[in-house]
Regions:
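Helix-rich, typically C-terminal accessory recognition domains appended to large enzymatic cores
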Residues: 3-181
């Protein structure tokens, strides 16, 4: 219970799901939970950035190169995640979630959006506002089984009038993933 109080339930759940593998024991120590606590902070900070800087949703007009790129990367994540869940490879599914969010969404997409935001490129920002929130909400949908508390909290913050948990990727206009990047 002390670990849950210090690191959070979602951090512990994600740690456990990431370290499940057949025929092996999980070595649980406070230091092993640090990356997952940091990951929950990263998710929270991304939501805060989206909520503060992208208050209104834009129109889904023509995607910029980077908007199309993040949609494609999300579709790759979704395909891999679905396959891993089908095959009961929970640790691989959580690995995919972790690396998509940290590497693709935060380290690339949000950083590129910040440049457009700071340069006041309104034409690019209109669609980026829409896509960023859309991809983030769909990501939270996938994260929900692993980290339900932060997923639900951020759902309430970002989608007061929306029911994103009931929407499929077809409703969002996502097509099949293109693996040729």
């Amino acid at each position: 219970l002390d670990l849950i109080e210090e690191y959070g339930t979602d951090s512990l759940r994600l740690f456990l799901s990431s370290n499940i593998s057949p025929h092996s024991d999980i070595k649980l120590s406070p230091n092993s939970l640090d990356p997952y606590k940091n990951f929950m902070n990263k998710i929270w900070n991304a939501a805060k950035f989206i909520n503060l800087n992208f208050e209104s949703e834009g129109n889904s007009k023509e995607d910029s190169f980077f908007d199309a790129w993040i949609c494609n990367e999300f579709n790759i994540l979704l395909d891999n995640y679905s396959q891993h869940i089908e095959n009961c490879e929970v640790e691989k599914a959580s690995y995919e979630l972790y690396h998509f969010f940290w590497d693709d969404f935060c380290d690339w997409y949000i950083e590129i959006a910040k440049i457009s935001y700071l340069n006041n490129k309104d034409d690019e920002l209109l669609n980026t506002k829409f896509r960023m929130k859309q991809v983030f909400c769909m990501y939270l949908n996938l994260l929900y089984p692993f980290a339900p508390f932060i997923s639900l909290e951020l759902h309430d913050v970002l989608n007061k009038d929306s029911k994103f948990f009931n929407k499929s990727r077809e409703l969002y206009g996502f097509n099949s993933a293109k693996q040729d990047h």
